[in-house]
From Swiss-Prot:
It catalyses: deamido-NAD(+) + NH4(+) + ATP = AMP + diphosphate + NAD(+) + H(+). It comes from the Bacteria. GO terms for cellular component: cytoplasm. Deamido-NAD(+) binds at R139, K172, D179, H259, K260. The gene is nadE. One of its GO terms (biological process) is NAD biosynthetic process. Homodimer. This is NH(3)-dependent NAD(+) synthetase. Belongs to the NAD synthetase family. GO terms for molecular function: ATP binding; glutaminase activity; metal ion binding; NAD+ synthase (glutamine-hydrolyzing) activity; NAD+ synthase activity. Mg(2+) binds at D53, E164. Its EC number is 6.3.1.5. The keyword Repeat does not apply. It comes from Staphylococcus saprophyticus subsp. saprophyticus (strain ATCC 15305 / DSM 20229 / NCIMB 8711 / NCTC 7292 / S-41).
């Protein structure tokens, strides 16, 4: 294992393997402890896309909230559907919600807000690319979640896990923004492992991962956008050897997107010593 890989593995907290029962218990307890340590928290809010990550985070949140209620805490889990117009995999969103059984479901169509924002920018002489429009969608979704959390006296739960974090495969202040990130420390295959343990419908964690933010490239697979497979990313994070090409791609993503993993720099934190 190279020096940089060793640094990355330690930073990303991924273990070579996880035991499903204890790992699930550890994440649920983390969520419960956070809520119980902040008396103002009355809800957990999370956007549900129908993919692996939000399905897992949603299930763990609902399980944690169920236990909190049993302990006498006033708390609820709010699942948010955030389509941009018609969502191509809307059926899988419904399947995820049926599996999660959230306390409350809220639906907000982000299309009017995103389109108006893009039009206003265009009128100001700022013409966004399709990729940049995708980031607008991600940020609008997170804005909505924070609005709901504020109204419901709660916090926003993120779906960021270590295979996304290491590559910076998320929108800064979009899906990368949240109050807690309970999946951090897991890689992609470990997330699948926990969903299998929690008896999730197989098609929700075996579907091809996609951010699906670009109109010109609908359902673009994550692995195609990243230029490397999740299997290689997972192997790298578990401290295993990967091809020199995959290693270079992963480490380039890690270095290039370091700013996404930091809070806003100040004159006291940049340049780093």
């Amino acid at each position: 294992m190279s020096n940089l890989q060793d640094i990355v593995v330690k930073e990303m907290k991924v273990k070579p393997s996880v035991e499903s029962k204890s790992e699930t218990r550890h994440i649920i307890q983390f969520i419960k402890n956070y809520v119980q340590s902040h008396s103002f928290i009355k809800s957990l809010t999370l956007g549900i896309s129908g993919g692996q990550d939000s399905t897992l985070a949603g299930k763990l949140c609902q399980l944690a909230v169920n236990e909190l209620k049993e302990d006498g805490n006033d708390c609820e889990f709010i699942a948010v559907k955030l389509p941009y117009g018609e969502q191509k995999d809307a059926a899988e969103v419904e399947d995820a919600l049926t599996y999660i059984q959230p306390d409350k479901i809220i639906t907000v169509n982000i299309k009017p807000a995103v389109d108006q924002s893009i039009q206003s920018l265009k009128e100001a002489g700022v013409n966004l690319t399709d990729f940049q429009k995708g980031n607008e969608k991600a940020r609008e979704r997170m804005k909505v979640q924070f609005s709901i959390a504020s109204k419901q006296k709660g916090i926003v739960v993120g779906t960021d896990h270590s295979a996304e974090n290491v590559t910076g495969f998320y929108t800064k202040y979009g899906d990368g923004a949240a109050d807690i990130a309970p999946l951090f420390g897991l890689n992609k295959r470990q997330g699948k492992q926990l969903l299998a343990y929690l008896a999730a419908p197989k098609h929700l964690y075996e579907k091809t991962p996609t951010a699906d933010l670009e109109d010109d490239k609908p359902q673009l697979p994550d692995e195609e956008a990243l230029g490397v497979s999740y299997d290689d990313i997972d192997d790298y994070l578990e401290g295993k050897s990967v091809s020199s090409e995959s290693k270079e791609i992963i480490e380039n993503h890690y270095i290039k997107n370091a700013h996404k993993r930091e809070l806003a720099y100040t004159r006291y934190t940049w340049p780093k010593n």
